[in-house]
């Protein structure tokens, strides 16, 4: 599925051009305590790969090698702490990329990949600090090939977005499942609410009901607002005790296989 999506994207690239899609990095709550990784949506859509600090480069230049991924290196010690890493070999074998390299090699190898191309597509402004890296890679590629015209950097958001706009059968069923999980969870939580409950208890019930049905994470921070809190559009304190006469507004939805649901 992911390889077919990549092939479709490559076929939509102009000849002699490339598309760069960076994955998400780990974000840290404090010290060495990180949040759960939520992979960048477009990166996951075309790769199926869910390790941090990865990078995908797709190329349309007539070569047999047109899908390249940079991934975290294999590291036995870090895998003891943080879990399995596919490494370059696993990225080729299990995710069907033509080539894969350790991500620390990207600064040297990406300019070589881009050398001689006419255009580089990249979604400008989506990942803080990464824009300059793409500019640096492109400048390095230009300096390696002074006899060719300079490479243009073009915003790739529309190119990627248009291919993702129309959902296939798998996506539609996945979206339906996400909505079903959330709808069933709403019903179960409504059965449990009583005066004296705290809003955070109700939030916890939603997270439990989502997870029990396969929605490991919420799609966004749930809003559980009793009484006047419901007048605050993005109320997320979720810490007040519910009175007997309170009405409760809940805005919550699970994420299932990277697809969100949203019910108020």
Model regions and ranges:
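Active-site pocket-lining segments that scaffold enzyme catalytic pockets across diverse folds
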Residues: 167-214, 220
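Short, well-ordered alpha-helical packing segments
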Residues: 10, 17, 26, 176, ...
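Secondary-structure boundary elements
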Residues: 15, 61, 113-115, 181-184, ...
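A broad detector of the eukaryotic-type serine/threonine protein kinase catalytic domain
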Residues: 161-164, 187-191, 228-229
């Amino acid at each position: 599925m992911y390889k077919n999506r990549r092939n479709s994207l490559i076929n939509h690239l102009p000849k002699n051009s490339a598309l760069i899609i960076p994955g998400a990095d780990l974000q840290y709550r404090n010290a060495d305590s990180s949040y759960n990784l939520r992979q960048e949506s477009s990166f996951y859509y075309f790769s199926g790969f869910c390790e941090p600090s990865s990078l995908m480069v797709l190329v349309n230049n007539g070569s047999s090698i047109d899908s390249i991924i940079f991934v975290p290196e294999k590291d036995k010690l870090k895998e003891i702490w943080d879990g399995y890493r596919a490494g370059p070999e696993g990225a080729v074998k299990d995710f069907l990329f033509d080539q894969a390299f350790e991500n620390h090699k990207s600064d040297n190898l990406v300019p070589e990949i881009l050398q001689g191309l006419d255009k580089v597509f990249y979604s400008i402004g989506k990942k803080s600090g990464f824009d300059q890296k793409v500019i640096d890679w492109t400048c390095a590629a230009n300096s390696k090939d002074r006899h060719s015209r300079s490479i243009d950097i073009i915003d790739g958001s529309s190119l990627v977005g248009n291919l993702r706009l129309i959902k296939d059968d798998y996506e539609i069923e996945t979206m339906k499942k996400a909505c079903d999980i959330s709808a069933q969870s709403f019903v179960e939580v409504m059965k449990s609410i009583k005066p004296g409950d705290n809003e955070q208890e109700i939030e916890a019930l939603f997270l439990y009901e989502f997870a029990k049905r396969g929605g490991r994470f919420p799609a966004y921070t749930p809003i559980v607002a009793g009484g006047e809190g419901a007048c605050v559009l993005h109320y997320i304190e979720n810490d007040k005790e519910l009175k007997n006469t309170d009405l409760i507004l809940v805005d919550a939805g699970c994420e299932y296989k990277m697809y969100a649901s949203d019910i108020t």
